[in-house]
């Protein structure tokens, strides 16, 4: 006997996240009351997570093209040409809400999902990165969330067999009720063997691949498009459950299948599951899709059409198959022990038709499920400008040596070794620069060429001045890639914001995108993929605006990649870039002086490019022994990191024309520290002058301590103890 679907009522519509005007739009579009299954389909396809209804208008203004861009936004992942017939495929995506509800599985399936986005394009994953934001350390849930998220990321990546090579982790009370878990994956493919999601051909079979479908993750995308209240625990069933070993089998089976020529189009079943993947493939190819859900492999009995369509069970793919190669394709998946089921076909009707148990459960216009989704030009208000804080107006509460010692043992600046040692960053044997440097560096194959990878954002800058913060997020990623000697090539972004229905939040979003676009254009650093995560809000309070940037650069010879560690005594230490001593929104002002205030440091994009290009040439010419960009904590923290990494001390001096605490801890942008031999230092200084690059000698390496002239020397061993001690002590509940 056919099951009875619930009646579509205003309450049911509201529970699906659809506003009254959006429901009226559905009625006008299809000319009738939708079935329960159709309501679920619209809810999935028109939610913020899938439709980008609040952000699409502004995303269009971002720069996405360059001669080396093969595929920009709109596919599973972005693709760039990296030479020698190879392409780099990469994307960053959020799994914020699920990771707060169930940190281990939420983070693990975030990794699994982004890996599928990459290998769906025909690329073999070679690296993962992440960007994590947790609440205040003293918040009662923070330890639990850190522990679960880190374990989930490590478990999935390690089991799947891809190294997690880099990331960025910080803490702030603004994330108490909404943590951020942004996962990035990078893969390598032949540039002429990229696979896309666009279906072609009428009557071609649609094939379900991978794991069986269960009830986990139903309405995961809808949940990710809503603000959190106090009922987060009740949403636990919306969190997917991952199996990295099955995903590894799926990877190998898909790559083998792609070599047979059987694949016409392929799409990961991610957010909104079977619904989204089927609709996207059909709509991109201007084709209809007809599904027979009786053929869907299920691991639970009695699943309804609604449940099968909206399940976000992991490790699943949907493919349009060349009908002449069905037997060959099936044999591949049988060999790998995975499901292979023909569940439908392409049609010329431009309709999305779903059948189950002899009934038509859905019959909808396929293009309108995506193209007719609401598109909002939401009201937005620019953030008020904050005044510049002069360093001379700040009374230092500690000596500069004391402030440095304090900063190195703070949650944001301390070593994250406790985190990255839970990730296998060597599993493929391709890691050249391991976690802890400016950017991760991996070797490609047996040759000298490599990739540099980084994730960056400074939310306190974005909150104080969204445009400047957006510029800085991109500039910081570009600078980190440059600091290891890479040529920055492209960006993936992950835009994490609060409720876009609030004009001040939408203003943050628009401002950050303005700054991001300006920086990407100025630095020739196009955006090729990304993700938007809105409604990161709990109890009416949004998170700090966090537009995460994932950067990818190419290194011609990884043997020349620069490292941040001081290598030997007697080297000259040179500071590249102008230093005014900018303390507004600095960690010194926040963690030493107890103030979050002032305008953030401006980013002069012309100076950023000029200084970075100069540093990259120094690295290529092998003129420097160590390089480090200057960011959080300023010059003194960067020097300490270089000294601790190499076990070599330094003696450095501030100029008389900048207040000392501003010189050591100001977060002025576009700056690097380089170390070079004394005999080369004069040549570097002269070359900088010719290039119009500010460069000054501030000291030399040597000894077992870091000495800021006029201050007590601090032993490197003491700095390291503070730097390495905070996070393990915190996680052991010793603080």
From Swiss-Prot:
Mg(2+) 2 binds at residues 117, 268. Substrate binds at residues 94-97, 116, 240, 312-314, 533. ATP binds at residues 52, 91, 493, 530. GO terms for biological process: 'de novo' IMP biosynthetic process. Its main location: cytoplasm. Mg(2+) 1 binds at residues 93, 531. The keyword Nucleotide-binding applies. One of its GO terms (molecular function) is magnesium ion binding. The active site is at 49, 95 (proton acceptor). Its EC number is 6.3.5.3. It is found in: Cytoplasm. Pathway: Purine metabolism; IMP biosynthesis via de novo pathway; 5-amino-1-(5-phospho-D-ribosyl)imidazole from N(2)-formyl-N(1)-(5-phospho-D-ribosyl)glycinamide: step 1/2. It catalyses: N(2)-formyl-N(1)-(5-phospho-beta-D-ribosyl)glycinamide + L-glutamine + ATP + H2O = 2-formamido-N(1)-(5-O-phospho-beta-D-ribosyl)acetamidine + L-glutamate + ADP + phosphate + H(+). Keywords: ATP-binding, Cytoplasm, Ligase, Magnesium, Metal-binding, Nucleotide-binding, Purine biosynthesis. It comes from the Bacteria. Coiled coil: none annotated. CDD domains: PurL_repeat1, PurL_repeat2. InterPro entries: PRibForGlyAmidine_synth_PurL (IPR010074), PurL_linker (IPR041609), PurM-like_C_dom (IPR010918), PurM-like_C_sf (IPR036676), PurM-like_N (IPR016188), PurM-like_N_sf (IPR036921). PANTHER family: PHOSPHORIBOSYLFORMYLGLYCINAMIDINE SYNTHASE SUBUNIT PURL (PTHR43555:SF1). Belongs to the FGAMS family. HAMAP family: PurL_2 (MF_00420). Part of the phosphoribosylformylglycinamidine synthase complex involved in the purines biosynthetic pathway. Catalyzes the ATP-dependent conversion of formylglycinamide ribonucleotide (FGAR) and glutamine to yield formylglycinamidine ribonucleotide (FGAM) and glutamate. The FGAM synthase complex is composed of three subunits. PurQ produces an ammonia molecule by converting glutamine to glutamate. PurL transfers the ammonia molecule to FGAR to form FGAM in an ATP-dependent manner. This is Phosphoribosylformylglycinamidine synthase subunit PurL. The gene is purL.
């Amino acid at each position: 006997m056919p099951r009875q679907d619930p009646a579509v009522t205003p309450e049911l519509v509201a529970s699906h996240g659809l506003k009254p005007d959006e429901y009226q739009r559905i009625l006008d579009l299809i000319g009738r009351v939708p079935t329960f299954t159709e309501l679920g389909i619209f809810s999935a396809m028109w939610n913020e997570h899938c439709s980008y209804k609040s952000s699409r208008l502004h995303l269009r203004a971002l720069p996405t093209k360059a001669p080396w861009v093969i595929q920009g936004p709109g596919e599973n992942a972005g693709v760039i040409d990296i030479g020698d017939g190879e392409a780099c495929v990469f994307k960053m995506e959020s799994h914020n809400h699920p990771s707060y509800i169930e940190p281990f599985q939420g983070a693990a399936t975030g990794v699994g999902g982004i890996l599928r986005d990459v290998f769906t394009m025909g690329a073999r994953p070679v690296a993962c990165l992440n960007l994590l934001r947790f609440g205040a350390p003293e918040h009662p849930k923070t330890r639990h969330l850190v522990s679960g998220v880190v374990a989930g990321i490590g478990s999935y990546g390690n089991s799947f067999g891809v190294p997690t090579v880099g990331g960025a982790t910080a803490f702030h009370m603004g994330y108490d009720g909404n943590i951020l878990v942004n996962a990035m994956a990078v893969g390598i493919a032949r540039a002429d063997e990229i696979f896309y999601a666009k279906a072609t051909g009428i009557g071609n079979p649609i094939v379900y691949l991978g794991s069986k479908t269960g009830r986990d993750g139903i309405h995961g995308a809808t949940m990710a498009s809503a603000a959190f209240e106090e009922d987060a625990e009740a949403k636990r069933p919306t969190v997917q459950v991952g199996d990295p070993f099955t995903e590894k089998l799926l990877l190998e089976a898909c790559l083998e299948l792609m070599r047979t020529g059987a694949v016409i189009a392929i799409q990961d079943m991610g957010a909104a599951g079977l619904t989204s993947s089927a609709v996207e493939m059909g709509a991109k190819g201007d084709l209809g899709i007809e599904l027979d859900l009786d053929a869907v492999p299920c691991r639970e009995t009695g699943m309804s059409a609604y449940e099968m369509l909206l399940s976000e069970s992991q490790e699943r793919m949907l493919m349009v198959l060349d009908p002449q190669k069905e037997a060959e394709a099936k044999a591949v998946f049988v060999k790998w022990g995975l499901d292979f089921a023909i569940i439908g076909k392409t049609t010329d009707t431009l309709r999305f038709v779903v059948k189950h148990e002899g009934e038509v459960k859905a019959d909808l216009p396929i293009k309108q499920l995506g193209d007719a989704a609401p598109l909002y030009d939401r009201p937005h208000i620019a953030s008020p400008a904050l005044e510049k804080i002069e360093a001379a107006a700040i009374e230092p509460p500690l000596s500069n040596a004391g402030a440095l010692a304090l900063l190195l043992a703070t949650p944001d600046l301390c070593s994250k070794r406790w985190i990255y040692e839970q990730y296998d960053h060597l599993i493929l044997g391709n890691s050249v620069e391991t976690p802890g440097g400016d950017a991760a560096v991996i070797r490609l194959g047996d040759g000298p060429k490599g990739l540099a990878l980084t994730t960056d954002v400074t939310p306190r800058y974005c909150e104080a001045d969204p445009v400047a913060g957006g510029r800085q997020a991109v500039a910081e990623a570009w600078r980190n890639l440059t600091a290891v000697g890479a040529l920055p090539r492209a960006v993936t972004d992950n835009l994490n914001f609060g409720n876009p229905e609030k004009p001040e939040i939408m203003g943050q979003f628009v401002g950050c995108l303005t700054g991001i676009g300006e920086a990407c254009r100025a630095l020739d650093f196009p955006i090729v993929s990304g993700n938007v995560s809105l409604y990161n809000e709990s109890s009416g309070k949004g998170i700090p605006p966090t537009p995460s940037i994932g950067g990818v650069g190419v290194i011609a010879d990884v043997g020349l990649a620069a490292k941040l560690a001081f290598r030997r005594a007697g080297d000259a230490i040179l500071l590249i870039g102008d230093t005014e001593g900018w303390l507004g929104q600095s960690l010194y002002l926040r963690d030493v002086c107890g103030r979050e205030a002032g305008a953030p440091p401006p980013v002069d994009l012309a100076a950023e490019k000029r200084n970075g290009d100069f540093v990259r040439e120094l690295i290529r010419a092998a003129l420097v022994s160590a390089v480090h960009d200057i960011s959080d904590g300023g010059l003194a923290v960067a020097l300490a990191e270089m000294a601790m990494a190499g076990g070599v001390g330094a003696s450095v001096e501030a100029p008389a024309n900048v207040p000392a605490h501003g010189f050591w801890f100001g977060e002025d942008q576009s700056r690097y520290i380089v170390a070079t031999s004394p005999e080369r230092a004069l040549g570097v200084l002269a070359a900088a002058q010719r290039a119009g690059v500010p460069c000054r000698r501030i000291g030399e390496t040597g000894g077992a301590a870091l000495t800021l002239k006029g201050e007590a020397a601090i032993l490197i061993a003491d700095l390291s103890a503070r730097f390495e001690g905070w996070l393990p002590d915190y996680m052991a509940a010793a603080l």
